[in-house]
Design a protein with these regions (language model features):
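Iron-sulfur cluster-binding electron-transfer modules in prokaryotic oxidoreductases
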Residues: 1-270
Length: 270
């Protein structure tokens, strides 16, 4: 960590998100492993489920409030809440307080928790120090690999995750970051957008994967499992790595793999 880095807490919460919990649990385990590697204890409230974003972005505010309220009651201690998804972190930071604009006690609770939320890539860079040699340590995996970075729309624009994610990748020995032509564009997931408009979503993800292939990337890394699910399944439908498609991996899992922690594999529960 640099002198300007936030102090390292003794404990943190991890809010895994519903997608990680149900579809990509290894990504959550890898994030927890990286935090514990730094000597930080992890609290994982068993009752956590969803941030409420699917209902919220579909216009079902009452339903979103019920889901969000259930999460608010889980985080009682004054400690960071690490979220391995920029999209969900953005929901918690920017939209939870708005959801409870007419409920003063809940709004105060939402604002307190919003101030505790830290998106994973920021935490990994600024607190764990994984973008500098001291925090990274001697990374045992140095095999050369070309990596493209994808940040979800809300992660990039609401939470500013592009710079820390890029810094974390750049610090890893043997990793070459390649620039894909559609780096700032949506992958077509967009939460429920991919279900409501599958043909448009399919065209968008095909364009994204084509740009990644043209850049020569072997691995496509993102800190958002929603996007990764979309990208992974689209890549598999086109033949997977055997046909030149990139391997899709959560940032936490890629870091864990290169650092030498157990796990590191992108495992999707179909």
């Amino acid at each position: 960590m640099t002198a300007a880095s936030p102090p390292r807490p003794a404990r943190v919460y991890v809010f895994a998100t519903c997608v990680v919990d149900l579809m990509a649990p290894q990504a959550g385990l890898d994030v927890v492993g990286l935090i514990r590697r730094a000597g930080i204890a992890v609290d994982f409230p068993a009752g956590q489920s969803c941030c409420g974003q699917p209902a919220y972005t579909s216009g079902f505010n009452d339903e979103a409030r019920r889901v969000a309220a259930a999460q608010l009651d889980l985080f009682v201690a004054d400690q960071p809440i690490v979220v391995p998804s920029g999209s969900c972190a953005g929901m918690m930071v920017h939209h939870w307080p708005r959801l409870f604009a007419d409920d003063a006690p809940r709004r105060a609770q939402a604002e307190r928790i919003a101030a505790q939320v830290v998106e994973f890539s920021h935490f990994a860079r600024d607190v764990l120090g994984l973008a500098d040699a001291q925090g990274l340590g001697q990374a045992p995996v140095t095999r050369p690999v070309k990596v493209a970075l994808h940040t979800s729309c809300s992660a990039r624009r609401e939470m500013g995750v592009h710079a820390p994610s890029r810094a974390l990748l750049a610090a890893l020995p043997g990793v070459e970051i390649v620039q894909q032509a559609r780096e700032t564009e949506c992958c077509g997931f967009g939460g429920t957008f991919s279900a409501r408009h599958p043909s448009i979503s399919g065209a968008m993800v095909a364009d994204k994967l084509a740009a990644v292939r043209e850049a020569g990337a072997e691995v496509l890394v993102s800190a958002d499992c929603g996007c990764l699910l979309n990208l992974h399944h689209a890549a598999q439908a086109q033949g997977g790595v055997a046909t030149g498609q990139p391997r899709c991996q959560h940032l936490g899992s890629f870091l864990a793999e290169r650092i030498g922690l157990a796990g590191g594999a992108w495992q999707v529960t179909d």
